Amino acid sequence: MARKVIANNKKALFDFHILERLEAGIALSGSEVKAIRAGRVNLKDSFVKIIKGEAFLLNAHISYLETTNPHYKPDERRPRKLLLHRKQIDKLTGSVSTEGMTLVTLSIYFNERNRAKAEIALAKGKNLHDKRETLKKRILDREVKAALKEH
């Protein structure tokens, strides 16, 4: 499965415990697809919300590309519909209703058929001490790798 990752949401991995990952298609306009191919995407603070039985990607910033139609300037942070099966949406709706659970966007990529996809995750927020533990663990892992590299 060759997938070309365009953008990652590193902040989501730091702020949340990831419980389950899903792949969802994204309903985009042509100029947005061109902008994604050019790498003009920012997923910081983006999340998924289920509204009236449909999943939407909110706060994802897809920049306007200057080479597209100059008379049409789309909203760069508009809600984008995510394409999921009904059973998946129902399952996510039930899971998100639990306190502390949320849906976050982890990455946007093109799959082997050149379709734009979003990797979303069911996540639970971390506390401050969890974030500190994550940082300590990363530092220890780095030190261990450096020590192994020396020998």
Swiss-Prot record:
InterPro entries registered for this protein in UniProt: SmpB, SsrA-bd_prot, SsrA-bd_prot_CS
GO terms of molecular function: RNA binding
GO CC list: cytosol
Compartment annotation: Cytoplasm
Pfam families with a match to the protein in the record: SmpB (PF01668)
This protein's UniProt keywords: Cytoplasm, RNA-binding
Keyword Iron-sulfur applies: no
GO process annotations (BP): trans-translation
Coiled-coil residue spans: none
Domain of life: Bacteria
Gene3D superfamilies: 2.40.280.10
Role according to the record: Required for rescue of stalled ribosomes mediated by trans-translation. Binds to transfer-messenger RNA (tmRNA), required for stable association of tmRNA with ribosomes. tmRNA and SmpB together mimic tRNA shape, replacing the anticodon stem-loop with SmpB. tmRNA is encoded by the ssrA gene; the 2 termini fold to resemble tRNA(Ala) and it encodes a 'tag peptide', a short internal open reading frame. During trans-translation Ala-aminoacylated tmRNA acts like a tRNA, entering the A-site of stalled ribosomes, displacing the stalled mRNA.
Family label: Belongs to the SmpB family.
HAMAP family for the chain: SmpB
Name of the molecule in the record: SsrA-binding protein
Organism of provenance: Wolinella succinogenes (strain ATCC 29543 / DSM 1740 / CCUG 13145 / JCM 31913 / LMG 7466 / NCTC 11488 / FDC 602W)
Lineage: Bacteria, Pseudomonadati, Campylobacterota, Epsilonproteobacteria, Campylobacterales
